[in-house]
């Protein structure tokens, strides 16, 4: 671990822990790392300082933006609200009453009432932060999946909590199994993170699994954080995704569930930063107070009006779902064409999936560099957890342009071949040497074996 500089020593202990965290921004490998390795011009690949690859000829299958974009109805509502001086000159509420009621039923499957409330926040990401801040104390334990969304682990640790991972694999169907959750619970467990659909696999929990996990948590006095932000698009036409809030009844009390969603994934509007937390008013009140004292930022009025229009636009949802199903079918065919590459589990909802490149004999990080060389941006697994961190690639298959998937079909075998030749070994190793995380050093050990093999050829 790198020693702290005198200035870094002034940071809080919580923040210092992120500097060398394997899931801290800049410490895990992404297509952005590949830009520098390849000596590309950032202005050509990601012009304007944007967070995604938008350069001409490039296709972004990395970060989870919905590349289909917003519905026309949402754009029109956004423009109208932005031009309304009466809206722009006043502070907005956290969430307009009409939107709050629609979100409660449309996203969480429950009506507003004395036992259920919705709070507007700055994107689903804001919901993650406020949920952790509201409920976690130093020493608490949080059950998460491995792999899982980048920020579930470091954000919890920033609050002083200890993360208890449950490995997702073929044995549990890449889902949380109640028996494994039960085994992970200790007297210190404060929260269980139920990301459903699960990022990065797109798998969904069954109703029975959700009810049993809810019962386990309820009996032990544990909060459930149910993140459902990927539940808008049904990749598998037969799949069913159930928001935990919708299971509330006299028999199955869900008052201990805090739910979070947003519009970035389902409605293609990440720039607007619109998200929602929902749960029992006594819990939501705590989140509201934390939010007010920390940021006091409510969702902007134009964004709220755009969201209201987007959620009412059912034809948009149908069209975008057709695109996503088409894209995954194409992606699946491509994977089948490449020996040593597999899809561990097919996604049910959302537009992210994982491919496993372990059978090719190279690391996902090397393949990431090769893919970008051939115009495809991707994310390898070391930012998602320890499990198969050098084998997994997470891919976004939401692009409306079929050329994206045709380009990927050409790029994947080329990227693998270049990686097998050892072209990117030293550069990937140098990245992890500089990051100096425990996970990265484990990947370096794999790379060292690869170097010996390449040298012997």
Please name every model-derived segment.
Residues 288-293, 310-332, 360-361:
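Structural signature of PLP-dependent enzymes
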Residues 248-286, 391:
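Active-site PLP attachment segment
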Residues 18-123, 130, 310-311, 419, ...:
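N-terminal small-domain helix-loop-helix segment of the aminotransferase-like
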Residues 83-216, 231-233, 238-251, 258, ...:
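Conserved core of the PLP fold type I
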Residues 361-367, 403-407:
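Short, conserved charged micro-motifs
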Residues 373-377, 385-457:
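PLP-dependent enzyme catalytic core of the Aspartate aminotransferase-like
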Residues 304, 308, 323-332, 343-357:
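Conserved glycine-rich beta-strand-loop-beta hairpin in the small C-terminal domain of fold type I
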Residues 159, 219-220, 374:
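Helix C-cap/helix->beta junction micro-motif
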């Amino acid at each position: 671990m790198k020693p702290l500089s005198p200035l870094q020593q002034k940071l809080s202990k919580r923040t210092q822990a992120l500097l060398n965290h394997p899931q801290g921004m800049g410490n895990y490998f992404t297509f952005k790392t590949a830009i520098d390795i390849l000596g590309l011009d950032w202005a050509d690949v990601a012009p304007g300082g944007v967070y995604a690859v938008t350069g001409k000829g490039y296709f972004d299958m990395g970060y989870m933006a919905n590349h289909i974009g917003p519905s026309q109805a949402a754009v029109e509502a956004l423009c109208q609200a932005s031009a309304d001086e009466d809206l722009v000159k006043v502070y907005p509420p956290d969430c307009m009453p009409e939107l709050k009621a629609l979100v409660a039923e449309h996203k969480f499957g429950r009506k507003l009432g004395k036992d259920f409330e919705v709070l507007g926040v700055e994107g689903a990401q804001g919901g993650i932060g406020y949920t952790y801040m509201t409920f976690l104390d130093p020493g608490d334990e949080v059950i998460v999946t491995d792999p899982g969304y980048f920020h579930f682990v470091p954000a919890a640790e920033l609050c002083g909590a200890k993360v208890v991972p449950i490995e997702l694999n073929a044995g549990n169907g890449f889902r949380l199994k109640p028996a494994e959750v039960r085994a992970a619970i200790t007297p210190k467990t404060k929260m269980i993170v139920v990301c459903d659909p699960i990022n990065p696999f797109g798998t969904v929990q069954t109703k029975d699994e959700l009810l049993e996990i809810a019962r386990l948590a309820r009996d032990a006095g544990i909060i459930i954080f149910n993140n459902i932000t990927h539940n808008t698009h049904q990749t598998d036409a037969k799949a069913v995704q159930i928001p935990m809030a919708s299971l509330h009844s006299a028999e199955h009390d869900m008052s201990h569930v805090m739910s979070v969603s947003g519009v970035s994934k389902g409605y293609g509007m990440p720039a607007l930063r619109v998200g929602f937390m929902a749960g029992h008013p006594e819990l939501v009140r705590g989140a509201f107070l934390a939010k007010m004292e920390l940021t006091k930022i409510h969702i902007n009025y134009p964004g709220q009006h755009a969201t209201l229009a987007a959620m009412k636009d059912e034809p948009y949802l149908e069209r975008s779902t057709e695109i996503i199903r088409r894209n995954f079918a194409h992606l699946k065919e491509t994977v089948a064409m490449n020996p040593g590459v597999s899809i561990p589990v097919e996604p049910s909802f959302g537009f992210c999936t994982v491919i496993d490149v372990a059978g090719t004999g190279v690391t996902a990080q090397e393949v990431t560099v090769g893919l970008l060389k051939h115009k495809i941006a991707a994310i390898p697994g070391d930012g998602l957890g320890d499990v198969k961190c050098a084998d997994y690639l997470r891919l976004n298959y939401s692009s409306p342009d079929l050329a994206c998937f045709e380009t990927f079909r050409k790029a994947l075998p080329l990227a693998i071949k270049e990686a097998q030749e050892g072209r990117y070994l030293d550069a990937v190793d140098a990245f992890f040497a500089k990051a100096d995380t425990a996970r990265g050093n484990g990947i370096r050990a794999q790379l060292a074996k690869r170097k010996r093999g390449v040298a012997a050829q």
